[in-house]
Amino acid sequence: MKIGIPKEIKNNENRVGLSPSGVHALVDQGHEVLVETNAGLGSYFEDGDYQEAGAKIVDEQSKAWDVDMVIKVKEPLESEYKFFKEELILFTYLHLANEQKLTQALVDNKVISIAYETVQLPDGSLPLLTPMSEVAGRMSTQVGAEFLQRFNGGMGILLGGIPGVPKGKVTIIGGGQAGTNAAKIALGLGAEVTILDVNPKRLEELEDLFDGRVRTIMSNPLNIEMYVKESDLVIGAVLIPGAKAPNLVTEDMIKEMKDGSVIVDIAIDQGGIFETTDKITTHDNPTYTKHGVVHYAVANMPGAVPRTSTIGLNNATLPYAQLLANKGYREAFKVNHPLSLGLNTFNGHVTNKNVADTFNFEYTSIEDALK
């Protein structure tokens, strides 16, 4: 199979679809890999590293797309839609529930789009989302602490406090991978940490995991309001696979927060959980202030630590990429059901129900689409 690795063009997206070691694994199995020149530079992988791994370096974006399968990190931007073609396998993060134009373009061009974030194991876990959730979760506390500093617009709070001075209060909405990792860093900094989640079993697991060092609270509108207004830092870490994020924190709740407090919306690439995160920000200009509260709404947080992120992502995605390349998508879906759940569009059909419902597209089951 001919596989393309284009350079990411989203603002400050420094990750790359495959590391040289991933390229080597695919080339070793007889596949041809085309890497756009400088695609790996943001992650400190040189063209020469890819050439040594067996890749062919191409000097035009179009050549990296003129392949059987494209492996990326982030969803294609509008300038890349012109490269879509029938039967192209696109393997990347898509977050289509927040991307109507992209969904339409994938359908119109009959692209076989497989979203990392909807590949799902029988236990409900999301193996290709996990590494980036870990990165984003850990980063969310770090950037929150940074923007609590006075010269960054915050109220001048040190999350860990000092003897005789109260600790900063961190509230995390969502106790999944991202929320759990946010809590680990917040605890490490010495903050007072509360996690809200709708799943009582998950709250029990978090109690055990953190040995009672975090406060675990059932997530409902009253509790969210109560804890949000008292917090110095609120982190939104809620995920419904393939669906738009629920709006859990209202504008009125934000108005009750202290001036100079900070919110970090990890879920912004799925629409966000805060009513006031009504725009996506970038690493170049990561925050804005509304009702006195600093809003951080960067959709590609792991792009700021690309070396760690690329290697972690490659570790997770490579076995699935090899399966697709070695067996073809039909056989790969047959032998690996979790991978088949990643299929979002196929031959002009939307095959993810959450995406179809969000934009009123006709839904076609994966089984029916593949007949």
UniProtKB/Swiss-Prot annotation:
One of its GO terms (molecular function) is alanine dehydrogenase activity. Pfam families: AlaDh_PNT_C, AlaDh_PNT_N. The active site is at residues 95, 269. Its EC number is 1.4.1.1. Substrate binds at residues 15, 74. One of its GO terms (cellular component) is plasma membrane. GO terms for biological process: alanine catabolic process; L-alanine catabolic process. It is an enzyme of class 1 (oxidoreductase). NAD(+) binds at residues 133, 177-178, 197, 219, 238-239, 266-269, 298-301. It catalyses: L-alanine + NAD(+) + H2O = pyruvate + NH4(+) + NADH + H(+). Pathway: Amino-acid degradation; L-alanine degradation via dehydrogenase pathway; NH(3) and pyruvate from L-alanine: step 1/1. Gene3D superfamilies: NAD(P)-binding Rossmann-like Domain. Keywords: NAD, Nucleotide-binding, Oxidoreductase. Catalyzes the reversible reductive amination of pyruvate to L-alanine. May play a role in cell wall synthesis as L-alanine is an important constituent of the peptidoglycan layer. NCBIfam families: alaDH (TIGR00518). Homohexamer. Trimer of dimer. Belongs to the AlaDH/PNT family. This is Alanine dehydrogenase.
